[in-house]
Amino acid sequence: MPENKKMNGLKYFYTRLGKPAQHIMTSPIPTAIVGAYMDTKNSAKRIEGFIRRNHIDLTDYIESKYRCFNDFFTRQVKPGARPIDPAPDVLISPCDGHLSAYKISGDSEFAIKDSYYTVDDLVGGDAIADEYMNGTCLVLRLAVDNYHRYCYIDDGFKSRNYHIKGRYHSVQPIVVHRHPVFKQNTREYCLLQTKNFGTVTQIEVGACMVGKIKNHNEAGVIHRGREKGMFLFGGSTIVLLFKQGVLDIPEELFEATLKGEEATIKYGAAICKKA
């Protein structure tokens, strides 16, 4: 389907007339059905067309015969294709994606266009908002042509994973800018006690037709650049919350975000330095 038709369809879902269809399509049932199908051998026949429609470059990926579509979707890169920035005082990107940066207010609030959030909204009401007053929120949106595995941003220790049940709205900007997706969608989060960046909250957000957020480990020691997990079928999002004074983010990144611009970044690449 042409991209403009997809965008028009998404716009319609978020109108008054489209609301009944939106309610059905963002419920867990369609996503569970599609996710189950993408684990079947029959789904492998969809791989070739998906590559062609989305102009996916497979140069960086290990050649493989995929058993099902999800095997393809979570395909691994070749050794060295996603180098980890070696400087320990550099914040690395946990994933391929499109980066936006937001300043968290003294009330632990921030806005993404017309959608307003508190820190507690993102983690299902847990009272951690005070820790992130005047801090920074980084949002990394993964598209369908990105590498769908993600890594730890630093050495340290992680908490257990907390799962929050929710809906499955699209994470396309046209939806995120109009609808409070990140406090309604299914998501998982954990607290990272990091060596260089203090306590960081990392949130993986499910999206329309994402079958599963698959994190590998529960509580324990973590290592910078080591794989943390993966998203199965569909694009999705990672949100990182940092305390005040931790990051030295160029003001230009915040300004670009306010203009609706995203920075393209790769897994393991430098985002900024610590303050």
Region spans (language model):
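Contiguous, well-folded functional domains in the mature portion of proteins
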Residues: M1-A275
